[in-house]
Amino acid sequence: MPYLQPPRPHPHPHPTSRLSRASPPSPFPFFPAGTSRSGRLQPVPVSGHSASRVSKGKFAVAAVTLDDYLPMRSTEVKNRTSTDGIKSLRLITAVKTPYLPDGRFDLEAYDSLINTQINGGAEGVIVGGTTGEGHLMSWDEHIMLIGHTVNCFGANIKVIGNTGSNSTREAVHATEQGFAVGMHAALHVNPYYGKTSTEGLISHFKEVLPMGPTIIYNVPSRTSQDIPPPVIEALSSYSNMAGVKECVGHERVKCYTDKGISIWSGNDDECHDSRWKYGATGVISVASNLVPGLMHSLMFEGENAALNEKLLPLMKWLFCEPNPIGLNTALAQLGVVRPVFRLPYTPLPLEKRVEFVRIVEAIGRENFVGQKESRVLDDDDFVLISRY
């Protein structure tokens, strides 16, 4: 059985939401007297001669003039990236987030993964997406990882932060923070679980689109609600609307590309045909975590049915259980990340771990990330973390 780390006291015993549990730090910790972190007026205590003019228990309210230093808003961002600059990206990797044995981010391993993506030809990375387990992060962790990626690699690869949420309030706040720390674009899923109407979807996305280049993510298998074409068409006129990561299939891809809307396939096993037969711009890929060079060839070098066929067993293996279970298992067996899982994710069973090693041999170890030989890990090699 995998090693299950014993529980430790949770630092936030009464969380109510990801934002209330761990709000992302402001990039400007110091504000002028009389303003809150949001820039609103706050009562300021007065003393001495001035205090005599104020009745006991009362406070004077400080005035804020246009010359006062106010916190950065969403219109003032660290990196200005054109929407067209995002629309042109063909290979975007939904990058894995690796962990240390205590459940914290393994930034050394993460940096190595990003460098490998750059060297393999990826043009962008999704930080904290489904594959990167953003839903298992506090917003503090989430924004920190986006900022870290921008600061270390933003000059060489586009950083797209997954700042979407089923709460419009959280999506707005996280997206402001993401652009403030320098992300080039945002990825936004439609509100899940607490589903809304068509008008609600449009209103939700309209709240975040003014902040910067935006990719909308349609994945009904996870959200249990399809984003219908009328929603995307209603939003397509917005200058910050970069396009859609579409997981419904080829017909939907063609529906949008015929209208001039940029589309990235969200399905590795369909991305070749989506790109070359149905007009997709490219792919937002899971498999490129493992074989970035081959995925680059698949998106840049024209139709290649033979290469696509060669990669299909790997692509199907990756999704034999919900993503990112397969990817986490694969990267651990390649020796590029520690075999640490944040629960509720657990490694694939032994027979699937054996199958992966055979797939690596068939495709060629030299095409995969890392330098170590692929090996079958035992159950006891894995560490499962419940407090993180």
From Swiss-Prot:
**Where does it reside?**
Plastid, Chloroplast
List, in alphabetical order, the GO biological process terms annotated in this UniProt record.
Answer: diaminopimelate biosynthetic process; lysine biosynthetic process via diaminopimelate
Enumerate the residues binding pyruvate: T131, I284
- What name does this protein carry? 4-hydroxy-tetrahydrodipicolinate synthase 1, chloroplastic
Any idea what job this protein has?
Answer: Catalyzes the condensation of (S)-aspartate-beta-semialdehyde [(S)-ASA] and pyruvate to 4-hydroxy-tetrahydrodipicolinate (HTPA).
Renumbered to this chain, region (Disordered) spans 1-51
Oligomeric form and interacting partners: Tetramer of modified subunits derived from two genes in different combinations.
